[in-house]
Amino acid sequence: MNLIEFTQKLLRIQSITPRDMGCFDLIEPELKELGFSTKRINYLNVENLYAEIGSGENFCFLGHTDVVPTGPVESWSCDPFAAEIKENVITARGAADMKSSISAFLFALKDIDLSKNRKKISILLTSNEEGDAKDGTIEKVLDELKQNNNAINYCLAGEPSSKNELGDTVRIGRRGSLSGSLT
């Protein structure tokens, strides 16, 4: 399976927050094939996946597999989970935030000779970032990693950031969201 096919397969999984719905089942074998050890760290109805390879300072890719609800499907110009390619663009719920980032990082790892790695590389994914984010990465998993002397030293989050166009901005320490209604 190539990068595009994998991304489409991941996007077709209807992982509406806080449910993973099988995304980790798709991702985990790919990581194991690269030599990563993996661990599911679940709290209540939230699934989390932690994978690592190597030793030393820990560089972690942080992400989430959940997506926000689609809203009325008839408001979409296409099926939000079809992940169809039109004019070289994959359109699907989660394409920008953030299943494509997960695919890109995973496939970048396939191009690295991990046997020459001098640090620990880890991946930490949660199924509950778009919702209340309880029982996921920040609230529980990072605490568990610290308690096991497995702190993260460096982190890359594949969250989209932008001012004018998707991906035109890199941000440091951004977390959270705001939702509301105007009446």
What are these model-derived regions, one by one?
Residues 88-104:
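Glycine/serine-rich anion-binding loops at beta->alpha junctions
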